[in-house]
């Protein structure tokens, strides 16, 4: 059995066990509620509403409240110097279709809804990154730190010596050119 539901001004075809992304709904995470705006129910027999099917309802569970990937909005008018750049993230709600009921018949899902708290997942990942950084810093012993510092100093000294050599060469060649000019003027 399937149903066509309307939410947020859009229509979605759903079956029991489907996961659907709809525009943001003001429902708590893990909340179970019914959608009564059913436009059509199909399957063994089809019922089309005018505009809604009476007695039909779809039971859903909120599994995620999040934002979509960042979309780039770029506007330009050529030869006018007009350029606008913006980004946008659309909020959405992910729904798990638990059951579709109509005319005494009910199509239920065998699966259970898995609720994902996006904020908690992000916080866990951030904590894991911080812990990994601390562990890496703790694993570096004082000997490694000293070696690294010594390498930096050695590189700097080598670089200073190379710079001094190039400066000396440049001044010698410059002095030779000046001397050559003076001798050519005298002659």
From Swiss-Prot:
<dbReference type="InterPro" id="IPR028909">
    <property type="entry name" value="bL21-like"/>
</dbReference>
<keyword id="KW-0699">rRNA-binding</keyword>
<dbReference type="GO" id="GO:0005840">
    <property type="term" value="C:ribosome"/>
</dbReference>
<feature type="region of interest" description="Disordered">
    <location>
        <begin position="157"/>
        <end position="187"/>
    </location>
</feature>
<dbReference type="GO" id="GO:1990904">
    <property type="term" value="C:ribonucleoprotein complex"/>
</dbReference>
<dbReference type="InterPro" id="IPR001787">
    <property type="entry name" value="Ribosomal_bL21"/>
</dbReference>
<comment type="similarity">
    <text>Belongs to the bacterial ribosomal protein bL21 family.</text>
</comment>
<comment type="subunit">
    <text>Part of the 50S ribosomal subunit. Contacts protein L20.</text>
</comment>
<dbReference type="GO" id="GO:0005737">
    <property type="term" value="C:cytoplasm"/>
</dbReference>
<dbReference type="GO" id="GO:0003735">
    <property type="term" value="F:structural constituent of ribosome"/>
</dbReference>
<dbReference type="GO" id="GO:0019843">
    <property type="term" value="F:rRNA binding"/>
</dbReference>
<dbReference type="GO" id="GO:0006412">
    <property type="term" value="P:translation"/>
</dbReference>
<comment type="function">
    <text>This protein binds to 23S rRNA in the presence of protein L20.</text>
</comment>
<keyword id="KW-0689">Ribosomal protein</keyword>
<dbReference type="Pfam" id="PF00829">
    <property type="entry name" value="Ribosomal_L21p"/>
</dbReference>
<keyword id="KW-0694">RNA-binding</keyword>
<protein>
    <recommendedName>
        <fullName>Large ribosomal subunit protein bL21</fullName>
    </recommendedName>
</protein>
<keyword id="KW-0687">Ribonucleoprotein</keyword>
<dbReference type="InterPro" id="IPR036164">
    <property type="entry name" value="bL21-like_sf"/>
</dbReference>
């Amino acid at each position: 059995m399937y149903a066509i539901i309307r939410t947020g001004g859009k229509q979605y075809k759903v079956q029991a066990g489907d996961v659907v992304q709809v525009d943001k709904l003001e429902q708590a995470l893990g909340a179970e509620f019914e959608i009564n705006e059913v436009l059509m129910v199909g399957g063994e027999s089809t019922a089309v509403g005018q505009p809604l099917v009476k007695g039909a309802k779809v039971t859903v569970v909120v599994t995620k409240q999040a934002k979509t990937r960042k979309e780039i909005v770029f506007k330009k008018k050529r030869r006018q110097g007009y350029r606008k750049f913006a980004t946008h993230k659309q909020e959405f709600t992910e729904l798990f279709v638990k059951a579709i009921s109509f005319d005494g018949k009910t199509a239920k899902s065998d699966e259970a809804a898995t609720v994902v708290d996006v904020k908690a997942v992000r916080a866990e990942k951030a904590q894991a990154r911080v812990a990994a950084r601390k562990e890496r810093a703790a694993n570096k012993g004082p000997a490694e730190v000293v070696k690294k510092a010594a390498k930096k100093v050695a590189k700097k000294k080598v670089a200073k010596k190379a710079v001094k050599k190039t400066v000396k060469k440049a001044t010698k060649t410059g002095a030779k050119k000046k001397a050559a000019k003076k001798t050519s003027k005298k002659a």
